[in-house]
UniProtKB/Swiss-Prot annotation:
It comes from the Bacteria. This is Large ribosomal subunit protein uL18. The gene is rplR. This is one of the proteins that bind and probably mediate the attachment of the 5S RNA into the large ribosomal subunit, where it forms part of the central protuberance. It holds the Pfam family Ribosomal_L18p. It comes from Colwellia psychrerythraea (strain 34H / ATCC BAA-681) (Vibrio psychroerythus).
Amino acid sequence: MDKRSSRLRRAKRARAKISELGANRLVIFRTPRHIYAQLIAPTGSEVIASASTLDKEVSAQIEKTGNVAAATAVGKAIAERAVAKGITKIAFDRSGFLYHGRVKALAEAAREAGLQF
């Protein structure tokens, strides 16, 4: 089993548990160059808000896109967009990525900006 399939197995288990909760979920996807965050409705069919290092608002604040500072900016942006739509309680879906580094920075920035999870 390689690294990617292990991550996808972890993600599958986590998503099954989150779907039982019936809460909006904050989904993270991380590449070496960028980080993406989407707030998805409990049904899984609607994206409520999104932010990434490719957004013009976020990329104007940062120098590089693949570091902790960029992840912090994305976390703050997604939280502001969610709070603007009246959503504060969510479930955090890290997509099988370890809660460390950029994933942790994004989560902590989202918490500081008003999301609860």
